[in-house]
Amino acid sequence: GRVGAAQGPDAIRKQLARLAFHQDSLSISDYGNLLCADGNLEDCQKALSVLTEQFLIQESFPIVLGGGHDVAYGHFVGIHNALQQKENSRIGIINFDAHFDLRPLENQPHSGTSFNQILSEYGSTTEYFALGIQQPANTQELFAIAKEKKVNYLFNDVCENINYKLVISKIHAFIERNDALYLTIDLDGFSSAY
């Protein structure tokens, strides 16, 4: 992924630790970082998918903190595998992001290929909705891929407060069409002014 992304999980934990927690009926466990020391992202994605699947089967709710969307594929595969053991579920992905992350997988996976990988392998049971897309951050090729793969998206300017009801109605309609949701957030989908 991007330079500095590996420090993302620890930085997020540090900020979350400052917040008060009032849910006595819930417990939170931190399973540490999944290190990709040798640079083999595919092995790390497989390990993450196995862990995610195990947690879901145990009826835990895994929250994966990544530095980039290079973790999205493994996280999704674990969700998919756990849900398919119970029933044939349709999974909707809601991604708050400035980028589609639909780049073609050429040599090896990276943070920009995750949703293309997911839709290429699981597209018949998966729907993708990207909110906050910034046109200058995505090439014409990526918009063509989004169209080909029937990606739902809203541009960042449409996601502003004045369009709140429109955005909420689109999200509700998306949720209604799917049996399960995978929510993922990339901070570049939000203006630092907010």
Regions found by a protein language model. Give the residues of each.
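Conserved alpha-helical scaffold segments that buttress catalytic/binding sites
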Residues: 1-194
